[in-house]
């Protein structure tokens, strides 16, 4: 016996190969793949596992025959209906192949022989009784008693199990030849006189090779064999005493040429002929003594409503014989004789036959059989064997449940065409019909897309837009079993020059302060220290007032805040700010009282000042840990580290290293050789080289990672600070880093954020409306100080921008037209030339080309290393833009003692300088009785007919006032001038 392979057995059991392999493993049978061969006992075990027994070949053949010939009741009825009354579907093998003397098809011989024995067992004891009943019944009488005019009724002396009953005394020239009494080599097996085991029953004394057996005293060339005393050429054989040319044989004493034969004593005009003593208007005519309204007429003394009527004393086991569903046993009453002539119904018009059907109905002598042309027109395609086979093989198309097409609020024509499964040209044509001229890349709204889909009968629904940014930023739920302890993140905060970086240097045993400009920290640094086998991550923040955002950012990413306070200086403004940041972030605070080595150190003063800000140390009954240290002498450091580890242990800081990384950008810069570089603190998950990340408005792939000691690493677990390379641009400090799996998703989120920030910048920019235009013209032009800032790191730019924007006043505004990380380049100089801006470089230098271009364009480049100097110089520049204040300075007074009138000059006042001096170009006021009569300019000043620039106190002078001649004796003329005073911010 051939061994079965795994895939063959899986196919037989209708399961997947993988499922079968797993099942074999469970029962102790080892297989390597789906091509492995299985022993018989292994196959038996599998059958036992799935509750299936191994079938024998005879049973399989029997079941196959039962499936082919519709042994079930419901399948039998349906098949018989299709064969009798739906000719287009009756094209199976052995049904209506009318080619004369066609040799038998040997493909069915083996199948019939194998099926003979189980078929005999199925009919068993019923055979003897049926055979005796059929032998005692007269031939013609049996046809009449079983109801004449029935399609495919039994024939006398019939064998059991035949679809059309037995045919005695068969004729010649049948499509499949005669059946002898043994009848070997027939496509459906032998027909013995008992007819057991044949799928279509036996033929008594029959001809060989006929698909439907012999007809008694039959005519030649009939596709369904002879009928007793019947006419020739009928598709279903003769009926006793019947007329010719009827598609279902003769009816007793019936009329000729009716499409479905005569009915005895029947009414005319019925589509399928008359029925004996029947009611009219039935779709298939009357049945003798039958009930009305049955789909296939009455049966004599039979059960009503049966599809194929009764069989007289019929043999059991026949597809249409007695003992089948819908049939009665016993003979019915004789049918009354129908009238000799009945009006012939109008023939039904049918479409022309195909070439293959016409050829099958053409006889050897080149002539058509009697009545064959008309009947072939009625039953087009009945004999098409290939079509029947195709009909059996082709399954009906599955009914698809049409789901609504999801369409976004805005969709391009090309995408809409793809969703509707149409071409873009068809969709554009529909749009033009709606009056919309669109190209394939043009977008249409949801309503228009719905109208187009409705034209094709497709329903639509609005697709809910997925917020990709929310999807990326969503924090997944953590599995408690996967959380492990992580190092604490400690931020060192405090006032400037209180020793924060020196304390961190002492812990790290390095010297960072030596390399800092001005001795102050101006950007965040992240470092990792290992002490007693446990790691601690330190984040150093600036203490200067300009770096508020850095301190706030440091507090947000930290687990523990170390507040450094100088023992000799106490709590200062930035110390208070750091306390507020730590409280806002809900971070535990450890106070490090530094500079204990100084002689004037006073730790109690520090503790007392801390209580004013709700920080009560443990020594005073509070819960705040205070540790005195000296960064210079390196004392108290071990105690400080122990306190850090203690607080971290109490808070049980945990993270999941097996998930996608998430962290915060501590600092970012543009390196000339490496490109954008970001210092990132990984807070959760593990960041690996090659991960796709999105950082604020920037996305990219991690090309390399460098730890705080300058070593390249391949992965960064939680609480690890690393520098990453591979970003598309310099991110902003404080941005959240998220590792994602889809690179396209990262790009989309970054681009969306960039667009949103640009729109926010446009909205926030101050604009002068038409309503305010006249007001601004009257008040004077708004003065702006355009500035271009270039710095070494992103954090410094952030600090500078915030510090400079605070300098803005109502009269002068600081306009940061461009900020960037990296050296000053030619683009910055060209932008400064166009906008008349000043260039500020913080810890960067201009390259040679930029310096040459700046000299040519006369652009001033200001370079700084300390943030104090930047703020002071910008203040001076802004002060120069302010309008000066004017102050009135009184020069002197002149008493008018005599007036003279000159025709060409006007009134000349002669006076005496009583106080100060009087200057020729000075402004004057004419005061009369303490009231200012006129204020204007001095026109001329003379002494003894000579022009004088000024006249001092105690001297006389003559003067004229511009556009004023009403000077009287006794008036006081006050000389004054307006002096401009420079304003400062």
Curated annotation (Swiss-Prot):
Residues 180-246, 288-324 have a biased composition (Gly residues). Residues 519-523 are annotated as: G2. One of the essential components for the initiation of protein synthesis. Protects formylmethionyl-tRNA from spontaneous hydrolysis and promotes its binding to the 30S ribosomal subunits. Also involved in the hydrolysis of GTP during the formation of the 70S ribosomal complex. Residues 485-654 form the tr-type G domain. The lineage of its organism: Bacteria, Bacillati, Bacillota, Clostridia, Eubacteriales. GO terms for cellular component: cytosol. Residues 594-597 are annotated as: G4. Residues 540-543 are annotated as: G3. It is found in: Cytoplasm. This is Translation initiation factor IF-2. Keywords: Cytoplasm, GTP-binding, Initiation factor, Nucleotide-binding, Protein biosynthesis. Residues 378-391 have a biased composition (Basic residues). Residues 49-401 are annotated as: Disordered. Residues 137-162 have a biased composition (Low complexity). CDD domains: IF2_eIF5B, IF2_mtIF2_II, mtIF2_IVc. Residues 49-58, 65-89, 99-113, 349-377 have a biased composition (Basic and acidic residues). Gene3D superfamilies: 1.10.10.2480, P-loop containing nucleotide triphosphate hydrolases, Translation factors, Translation initiation factor IF- 2, domain 3. Residues 630-632 are annotated as: G5. One of its GO terms (molecular function) is GTP binding. The gene is infB. GTP binds at residues 494-501, 540-544, 594-597. Residues 494-501 are annotated as: G1. Belongs to the TRAFAC class translation factor GTPase superfamily. Classic translation factor GTPase family. IF-2 subfamily.
